[in-house]
Amino acid sequence: MIPSPTVTEALCITGGPRSGKTGALVERAAAWAEAIPAGPVAQPPFLFFCASPVTIDDTTSRLSQRGLADAPAEAAGPAKSAACQHGPRTSLCTGLVTTPFDYACRILADPLAQRATGRGGRVLSQAEEAVFYEDLKTCGLKRRRLRELWAFLQCGLVNLSDSDPDWIQTTEEQAVLDLARSILIFEEAVLPGEAVNLAVRALEAEPALRQRFGSPVVLADDYLLMSRASQRLVNLLATGKIAVAGSEKTALPAFEPYPCATGFAEFETAHAPLQRVTLEAPFRSLERAWEAAPDLAGEMALIARTIAEELAGGTSPDAIAVVGTNRTWRANLQRALTSVDIPAAPMRHPAFKAPKGDLAPASDNEREHVLRQLRDSITRPDDSHGSRACTRAGINDAATRNNPPASPCAGDSIAWRQWLSFDDALGRSAAVSELRRIAQPQGLNLAEALAALDADALPGLPATSPFTQSLLTPYREAQRLLAKRSGNDQPTIVTSPAAAANRARESSSSSKADTALSLANLTETRENDAAATPTSPAPAVAIAAPEDLFGHTFEVVIFGGFVNGFIPSRDMCDPGVIVGGARVRQEATDRDTIALAEQRATRRLLFTSFESCDLETAERLRLHIPRIRLRNGVRTCDIEPSNYLQELNLGIRQTSGPTDQSHPSA
């Protein structure tokens, strides 16, 4: 690890879950911030990094009580400036609370960072990343192999392995990586998983960026839940003092999919001598129990009855969480609770999730959203300020020759690619691949290439080509819709053959104006998740996957579906399917899942299971089936409680009564 050469004090706080690590960081932030001399500042007095967006509000609330941060609603977001705007410091000046990912996007918005990395554009949303993955399938690899290979490459980027000359060892790996970079450059895009990597490379290449975005005090919570790239970013930004905190016990990934478990060791090596503080978690009296129901319907009735008793005793619905590892089980439980007038809502946890499977059919709302993006990114003829222009950074000469600045009239390349994916994702991926092969050597991005193609000014792709027709049909449909909806404020797309032919030669004059990185959709994934989750003023019981519990605490946590097939999974129940190191890692993950549920409960933790299920349901839920019986003409499977149950030392099991046949899930 390459630390900042100006760091004068380093602190590492370790301890178990809920041992007061965040509180200790807040106290240290207060002490260090008070010691900063007053005067004009261009940097925030401190940066506080959280491993997940979930914990930002809580951390900001704690800091605001000390006068060190704005209200939680004003917590640092990716679209705001990273500089402290409070002028001369006469008292404690508020710092910034953010995540490494959001702050990396701030850094990439700087023209100096863009020149250092040679990359412009904006960060892809989750839906846009899925389209990118569709384009990646044109490499010709089988889906499973491509998925494995892409996971390896993504892991390498967040672990900064791209600086190792021995990282890529096969032609196959190099081909996929080159294709991915070609697609991203053609569409002027940045993958969420590479944003922190690019920011680190920019900081290492340009010391001026450290001075501009660094801070005299940097703090990082849940340090071991960050990737190596995020940890490196935190260290590079510290210009005076740095403190990190985290638990050395293994834990489920919170936000970033590839956390670096060796972060403390690397931190100690980089900042020796190091001050260490170890905190002990106080004893917590937690009521732990396990109850079993005769069947699946009985378990849901048991959970509903338990929640009803808690609500009758005065427990707030939002202080109760029901955890299950199976998505279908959680959906059925939510319907069952709602039908008996128990408010319940799914909990969603923001995370970098790799696209899987085929693209889902686009809804009307998605089409409207993309059309708005296109409308806002296309410059009107009378728009003298270019407020709707898609801008990109000026970069070094070699990169400029290959990637000339985008035309302000062609539109957002990412939005155009999203629009082309509607209705025929597979065919359009092949067509865009052919368009990229011809247009990219001419210095055109996707939006410019489509404009040239529409004007029949793109040599190499004749109008009679089926690829041309596949692209121009939706392209012209979008133009028609934009013209219809804009009316007098109609945006136009320059399709002049002369303009398309000259775009590759406009780098010199245009690059001076093209200095901003468009991050309009940076938080689109998170906003879409919030929009998909129905918000109600009334509190509701949380229905969650185990990883969703991170950053939250509940009085009562019910771990339902605690059976073989759910945890451990069906494949884990067969000793011959998952073996060796993979089995050891999965067992560790399962135990971390159970531990997280226990850590998030403050008063009561209840495990529930069921003893039987019909064969059809068992197969649909992928339950482990040790034995099948015929009961009343129905093939019924015996379902065993989780193999991890004996490790919990819960004593004699409590079996609930017979199923209430009037219950909606029965």
Enumerate the predicted regions with their spans.
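Helicase P-loop NTPase motor core
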Residues: 4-42, 271-347, 359-364, 368-400, ...
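Accessory N-terminal region flanking or inserted into the helicase ATPase core
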Residues: 1-19, 23-24, 45, 114, ...
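Catalytic acidic motif of RecA-like/P-loop NTPases
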Residues: 54, 223-227, 249-250, 547-548, ...
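Structural recognition of the conserved hydrophobic beta-strand(s) that form the central parallel beta-sheet
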Residues: 48, 97, 241-247, 607
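Conserved helicase C-terminal RecA-like lobe
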Residues: 217, 221, 376-638, 643-647
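Conserved P-loop NTPase-based nucleic-acid remodeling module centered on helicase motor cores
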Residues: 14, 41-152, 175-178, 266, ...
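Conserved RecA-like helicase ATPase core segment
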Residues: 231-301
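Catalytic P-loop NTPase motifs of RecA-like helicase/translocase cores
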Residues: 104, 220-234, 251-253, 551
